[in-house]
Swiss-Prot record:
It is an enzyme of class 5 (isomerase). One of its GO terms (biological process) is protein folding. The keyword Ligase does not apply. Its EC number is 5.2.1.8. GO terms for molecular function: peptidyl-prolyl cis-trans isomerase activity. The lineage of its organism: Bacteria, Bacillati, Bacillota, Bacilli, Bacillales. Keywords: Isomerase, Rotamase. This is Putative peptidyl-prolyl cis-trans isomerase. Residues 14-195 form the PPIase cyclophilin-type domain. PPIases accelerate the folding of proteins. It catalyzes the cis-trans isomerization of proline imidic peptide bonds in oligopeptides. InterPro entries: Cyclophilin-like_dom_sf, Cyclophilin-type_PPIase, Cyclophilin-type_PPIase_dom, Cyclophilin_A-like. Belongs to the cyclophilin-type PPIase family. Pfam families: Pro_isomerase (PF00160).
Length: 197
């Protein structure tokens, strides 16, 4: 299963473990620098420098995803460590499965600081059969069938990590009440992100 690191919850050699502390609990992820080096470097540097501390999940759509990482909390803000937007790092080894940590963007090669965590729990059966026909690897099709996810975002958003603990926190955040533009009525705050290398 080495080809598909998301299918294994153990932190493997070369992966980076991070713990995201929120006011709704903790979520633990493993990041994939071998798959998305610039994206992981961007996230880890921001995490270590406290860039994400106090930032909210400004967009929460239950049974789809939770999005954060924007200091302006508008969906329009946030910068990369590289000064401008940076390129996508798509891979045939990482997919937008349930619990994937993935980059938000506004089109090709527009990555900054915003990210989302996939929270869709079921992929429709007709879509699963299309994935197999469309060239998705069978272990990934099976994982989408078992875990859920958002396969239509594959090759459109860079996947650079996977939740390995704290799914209950992800669900709690996803179930928060929201108002206009899917913004939570009560702030869901990222207090800090610890990097364990």
């Amino acid at each position: 299963m080495a080809n598909y690191p998301q299918l294994n919850k153990e932190v493997q050699q070369g992966e980076i473990k991070v713990v995201m502390h929120t006011n709704k609990g903790d979520m633990t992820f493993k990041l994939f620098p071998n798959i998305a080096p610039k994206t992981v470097e961007n996230f880890v540097t921001h995490a270590k420098n406290g860039y994400y501390d106090g930032i909210t999940f400004h967009r929460v759509i239950n049974d789809f995803m939770i999005q954060g990482g924007d200091p302006t909390a508008t969906g329009m803000g946030g910068e990369s460590i590289y000064g401008g937007a940076f390129e996508d790092e798509f891979s045939l080894n990482a997919f937008n499965l349930y619990g994937a940590l993935s980059m938000a963007n506004s089109g090709p090669n527009t990555n900054g600081s915003q990210f989302f965590i996939v929270q869709m729990k079921e992929v429709p059966q007709n879509m699963l059969s299309q994935l197999a026909d469309g060239g998705w690897p069978q272990p990934i099709v099976d994982a989408y069938g078992e875990k859920g996810g958002t396969p239509w975002l594959d090759q459109k958003h860079t996947v650079f990590g996977q939740i390995i603990d704290g799914e209950t926190t992800l669900e709690d955040i996803a179930n928060t009440k929201v108002g206009p533009q899917d913004k939570p009525l009560h702030d869901v705050v990222i207090e800090s992100i610890d990097v364990e290398e």
